[in-house]
Amino acid sequence: MKRIVLSEGKRDVFLVEQFFERIGRNVEIDTFHASEVAKGEVKGQETRKIQNFMERRNPYDLLVKSEGGKPDLKRIFTKLIRSLSAREMGFVLLIDLDNRPLSALFDELNQKVRGNYDGNEYGIEMTEKIGEDTDIIAAEALFFAVDDSTTSSFDVLAFKKDLEHAAGIPSPDDTDEERINELLTEYSSVRRQMEAVLL
């Protein structure tokens, strides 16, 4: 089954790519970086990328998108969740909690998705915490219509603080890929939670 991973930034995309390389799975990965597209062209290019990815002849198994930061990720997630959940594919939200509880993220997303679809009531709730370690939480969530006509599950990988803290990257401008790779050693907690969600 095809899957889409929505994430905050380029480092998150790199993390997912390296994860599959490290575990030796033959997964064809396509990427999309919103920060590399002119502001007025993001929506059109994003729509084309998703439509192309969903085509039967498309060779990719996984589309990993970076949205250019948490505010844009939350906004785009709440706009796309309805259309993406109607398709037969897996869906993963990769996000930083910035030391907030996971429940606060779900409360915020639930409030945003309810406000995005006038005339229909939708919601988001966590259904199961799959795993939790020092730096990351893996969870399963549900997008639903209040009238029970639509339900779709999706997964969440949430860094308790952020990816940079977990990897020991001292500066937001540092592009230390080696430190991100160290998060994916065979017995690391981050790798275990990623395996629980992505495999």
What does each of the following model-derived ranges do?
Residues 30-38:
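Mature soluble extracellular domains of secreted precursor proteins
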Residues 2, 13-14, 18-29, 43-199:
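C-terminal accessory helical subdomains adjacent to catalytic cores in phosphodiester-
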